């Protein structure tokens, strides 16, 4: 208790140090309201929280906020530490590299080139690419990828995940990132389905657009983006330089992991600048929000015309995915938005399509959970209609003896869910999300992340049979507890996703059961077979695992990834998450596969 009190006292003293601007009494009162109205979707056992308490709860070292009202930035403020060891506080000038918000500004760069007739958004990207060409194959079904596809994540491309690179590492070129390289654990960017079919988020597509910009303009990406996008918007504190310039280092927020430990090297280098390499401030991002709101109404054109701005904010294949932004409808009000997450950082912004409201929030933390609480508080204080309507619920504590009978896997509407225990409580997994369980009574539970309320059901003998589901009082098809995975006939991606979740939580026996069923349902699905090998491996059944690995190394390409690439990628993931590195090295050695650097 004493430590917590000291931490909060320290933060309060830091707040005094970082008061960069003196506001009117009315604005100061609004700031205090925002600071004391933080809340999740469900407010449990009481009232909204205080910003310092919530920072402490989530291990967030520092954050920065800027708020827009009536097309003006009404206040901006920093909280906590930009660097805890250096005792360097967050100010409104502190720079963050939150991640995918970069995609919004990359889209503006493409749209500016289209507005200037330097390119066409509906033309094959290979028309403009010079230093690298996209290798079409049969999966694209003869259809060509356009810039509209890339910016709206509808090009049918693989993801291209990246954690960034340490400041001492050798940084790959974009061309090296775009082409498969099993030795370095890079899967490259290739077609997974035909362009324009549906939405699939892809960093890879955005990286291709970055290459395209440099090929067309014959300028370094960061120079073109500063001169033609950031500077016209008045975002003069921001930049895309990777690594950052030496004279900016003292303005950079140090990144922190979700547990509050400092990121090695303080920040990573991100060669995928368009996808996640923008260093910026909430104040600068709010300048973009305001200009976009005004340009949308035809009242400004610092960068884009009204016509091009409307195109920027218009969804294409997916009803919410526009060009560089997502459209979030709350009641009758639409917001353009993008969230973001890099290792050590996270952020989000919202701008209303009408009315001139907005907010941008950045954290130097990999933990994103505080972001919606701050956005909800701003929306409440500034009365954004329908943006946030809290649900008030009570929670009771249940003994493990009751909890244990609920653990297991469930089936609802052709989807799978799982209930399991972690050190800090019981969790509900579905759709790839781990969500903590809160109980209103012995059988009814709810989650912050899901609107569906759930009530366990049991038979006459008291055995749990499933749970009832409802939203806003409307009954949904119930979930049934799975007693025999061998009878399941669900989509293979559901089986595979659940199995991967079980592997992550070291429930290898259960994973094996589901993956065996997956092979019956989809015998040619390479990822299912490889995941079965992983399950055997970590379940101390080495011979079974190595036999499957060896056989699959001769299997044909599935989704343009060979078994070798899958094994390499998955092992890199397992290594980062504390799995047995020596065991995986033995597999790679026995299979005569190249061992990636740092393994």
Regions found by a protein language model. Give the residues of each.
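Catalytic loop of the DD-peptidase/beta-lactamase superfamily, centered on the K-T-G motif
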Residues: 20-77, 214-227, 266-496
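Short, surface-exposed loop or secondary-structure junction motifs
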Residues: 79, 83, 137-343, 347-349
């Amino acid at each position: 208790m004493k430590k917590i009190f000291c931490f909060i006292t320290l933060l309060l003293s830091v707040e005094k140090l970082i008061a960069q601007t003196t506001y009117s009494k009315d604005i100061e009162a609004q700031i205090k309201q925002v600071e004391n109205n933080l809340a999740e979707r469900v407010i449990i056992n009481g009232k909204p929280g205080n910003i310092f308490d919530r920072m402490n709860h989530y291990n967030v070292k520092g954050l920065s906020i800027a708020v827009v009202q009536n097309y003006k930035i009404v206040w901006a403020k920093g909280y906590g530490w930009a660097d805890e060891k250096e005792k360097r506080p967050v100010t409104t000038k502190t720079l963050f590299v939150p991640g995918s918000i970069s995609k919004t500004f990359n889209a503006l760069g493409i749209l500016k080139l289209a507005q200037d007739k330097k390119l066409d958004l509906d033309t094959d990207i290979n028309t403009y690419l010079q230093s690298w060409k996209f290798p079409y194959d049969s999966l694209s079904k003869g259809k060509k990828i356009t810039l509209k596809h890339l910016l709206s994540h509808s090009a049918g491309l693989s993801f291209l995940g990246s954690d960034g690179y340490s400041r001492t590492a050798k940084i790959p070129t974009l061309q090296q990132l775009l082409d498969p390289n099993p030795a370095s654990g890079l899967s490259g960017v290739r077609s997974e389905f035909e362009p324009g079919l549906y939405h699939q988020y892809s960093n890879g597509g955005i990286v291709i657009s970055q290459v395209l910009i440099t090929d067309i303009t014959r300028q370094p990406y960061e120079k073109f983006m500063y001169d033609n996008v950031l500077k016209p918007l008045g975002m003069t504190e921001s930049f895309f330089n990777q690594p950052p310039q030496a004279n900016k280092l003292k303005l950079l927020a140090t990144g922190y992991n979700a547990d509050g430990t400092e990121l090695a090297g303080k920040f990573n280098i991100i060669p995928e600048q368009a996808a996640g390499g923008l260093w910026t401030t909430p104040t600068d991002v709010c300048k973009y929000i305001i200009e976009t709101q005004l340009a949308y109404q035809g009242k400004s054109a610092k960068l884009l015309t009204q016509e091009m701005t409307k195109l920027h904010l218009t969804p294409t294949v997916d009803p919410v995915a526009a060009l560089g932004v997502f459209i979030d409808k709350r009641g009758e009000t639409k917001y353009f938005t993008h969230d973001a997450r890099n290792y050590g950082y996270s952020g989000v912004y919202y701008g209303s399509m009408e009315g001139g409201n907005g907010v941008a929030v950045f954290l130097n933390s990999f933990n994103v959970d505080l972001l919606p609480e701050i956005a909800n508080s701003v929306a409440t204080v500034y009365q954004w209609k329908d943006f946030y309507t809290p649900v008030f619920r009570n929670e009771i504590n249940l003994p493990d003896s009751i909890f244990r009978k609920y653990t297991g896997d469930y089936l609802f509407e052709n989807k799978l869910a799982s209930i399991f225990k972690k050190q800090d409580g019981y969790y509900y997994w579905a759709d790839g999300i781990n969500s903590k369980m809160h109980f209103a009574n012995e059988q009814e539970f709810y989650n912050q992340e899901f609107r569906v309320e759930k009530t366990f059901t049991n038979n006459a003998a008291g055995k749990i049979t499933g749970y009832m589901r409802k939203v806003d009082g409307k009954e949904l098809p119930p979930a049934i507890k799975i007693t025999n995975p061998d009878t399941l006939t669900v989509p293979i991606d559901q089986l595979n996703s659940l199995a991967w979740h079980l592997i992550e939580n070291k429930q290898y026996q259960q994973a094996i059961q589901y993956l065996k069923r997956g092979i019956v349902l989809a015998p040619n699905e390479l990822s299912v077979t490889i995941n079965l090998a992983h399950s055997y491996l970590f379940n101390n059944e080495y011979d079974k695992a190595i036999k499957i690995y060896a056989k699959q190394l001769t299997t044909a390409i599935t989704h343009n990834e060979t078994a070798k690439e899958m094994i390499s990628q998955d092992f890199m993931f397992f290594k980062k998450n504390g799995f047995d590195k020596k065991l995986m090295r033995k597999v790679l050695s026995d299979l005569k596969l190249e061992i990636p650097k740092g393994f």
